């Protein structure tokens, strides 16, 4: 897997003019964190980028997995706004593959703009709304079971990495997963199930309710013309948030929301 820290350093050196000229100092520290516009909250360790508390919890999870013969590894952790915007715009333009639920590449010409947007959002977060911006979320796999290139698909999770995910299921059911749970465990008709996507609940629950359509609009008013087909996004924004951004509270035990992490 690519080194995301190196990626972001390269991207920063060649940062688009819309980021250079966006006046990021006008945003609060919390807003910059939530939208992936700052890396001040991020610590890099062994190519993994998370907040320090989440990194320390991850160390515990990895060590626990090793006791069960699993080599839990991280495919992706922190993701900057810039990177998410680059990915999203390339998909909007049809320059990067968009897949269906059966991992088949879709033909852009066969879809209306609205249908194409929905197909993208099934697997890729709207920039500024990705949980990977927060330094609390990561994608995992079992390095010892990897054969060939990593795809991060549901079928892969049910075959190559089945042992890892069964183990995670058991640890989460006992609340012994060091605070990590799955926000996209089931298909609710929006984001595709992502069994590999783990979120550190003690911190993630602090940020998820701060995201709202009006805040997104305020930030993008400052950033300027950074996303293709912005008018389409703006027109459907409330529905996008309802279907593809909001995650029901039941994704983690309630006590993590009160700051109690027994």
Regions found by a protein language model. Give the residues of each.
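Cell-envelope/glycan interface and biosynthesis
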Residues: 2-261
């Amino acid at each position: 897997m690519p080194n995301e820290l190196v990626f972001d350093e390269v991207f920063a050196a060649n940062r688009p003019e819309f980021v250079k000229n966006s006046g990021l100092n006008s945003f609060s520290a919390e807003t910059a964190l939530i939208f992936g516009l700052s890396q001040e909250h991020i610590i890099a360790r062994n190519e993994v980028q998370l907040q320090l508390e989440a990194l320390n919890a991850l160390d515990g999870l990895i060590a626990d997995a090793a006791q069960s013969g699993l080599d839990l590894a991280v495919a992706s952790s922190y993701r900057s706004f810039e990177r998410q915007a680059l990915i999203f715009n390339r998909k909007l333009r049809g320059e990067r593959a968009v897949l269906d639920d059966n991992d088949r590449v879709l033909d852009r010409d066969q879809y209306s703009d609205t249908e194409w947007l929905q197909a993208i959002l099934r697997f890729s977060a709207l920039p500024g709304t990705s949980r990977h911006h927060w330094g609390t979320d990561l994608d995992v796999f079992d390095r010892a079971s990897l054969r060939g290139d990593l795809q991060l698909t549901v079928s892969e999770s049910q075959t190559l990495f089945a042992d890892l995910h069964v183990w995670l299921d058991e640890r989460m059911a006992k609340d012994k997963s060091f605070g990590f749970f799955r926000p996209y465990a089931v298909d609710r008709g929006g984001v595709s199930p992502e069994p590999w996507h783990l979120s550190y609940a003690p911190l993630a629950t602090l940020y998820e309710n701060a995201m709202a359509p009006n805040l997104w609009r305020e930030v993008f008013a400052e950033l300027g013309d950074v996303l293709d087909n912005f008018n389409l996004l703006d027109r459907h924004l409330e529905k996008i948030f309802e279907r593809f951004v909001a995650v029901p509270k039941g994704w983690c035990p309630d006590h993590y929301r009160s700051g109690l992490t027994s």
